[in-house]
């Protein structure tokens, strides 16, 4: 039971949880009120860094959501890696209550990763996509070798982006690849002829919600727990 509890918390949260629980012990030694405040902070840390198991639909042509959150926009834009190419950008906003663990959206190979320094304006603003600190992931899809781009974007509160994959690595849809601490945004850039299956304003679940299909939608889906 303890193993399952720890396993369902992202390792980036361990230090915050340990410090806050230690502060709770010290707080209770000083006063009950201070101890309760520190304990509440500890529980909030556990909630924020939770990493639940997800039922991931299987299929190399599926594009699943890389994050929990709200779809802010779906629009055609210039590719962030090639101004001469148009792509579809799906922007997902994560508030502080969402699960912040990020997941691979499509099975394939990591073609490149890039850290881009920047500012920390609110991730709910469209200009944050170009101005804020972000980590870029380019995935070559397994089914047709097309490039799928994922940008982890820091927000007003988020000041730490973690990306745990490297160039040349083989990845599968739904696998965990990183986390953004606190409020943030994830942009997903897809080829123009991708079949989009979500809409602006929709709430999505990382690893579970199918955002798009690289080919026609399958008649039947199978799922796996990750």
UniProtKB/Swiss-Prot annotation:
Keywords: Cell membrane, Decarboxylase, Lipid biosynthesis, Lipid metabolism, Lyase, Membrane, Phospholipid biosynthesis, Phospholipid metabolism, Pyruvate, Zymogen. The active site is at 184 (schiff-base intermediate with substrate). It holds the Pfam family PS_Dcarbxylase. Disulfide bonds: none annotated. GO terms for biological process: phosphatidylethanolamine biosynthetic process. It is found in: Cell membrane. It catalyses: a 1,2-diacyl-sn-glycero-3-phospho-L-serine + H(+) = a 1,2-diacyl-sn-glycero-3-phosphoethanolamine + CO2. Heterodimer of a large membrane-associated beta subunit and a small pyruvoyl-containing alpha subunit. This is Phosphatidylserine decarboxylase proenzyme. It comes from Ehrlichia chaffeensis (strain ATCC CRL-10679 / Arkansas). The lineage of its organism: Bacteria, Pseudomonadati, Pseudomonadota, Alphaproteobacteria, Rickettsiales. The gene is psd.
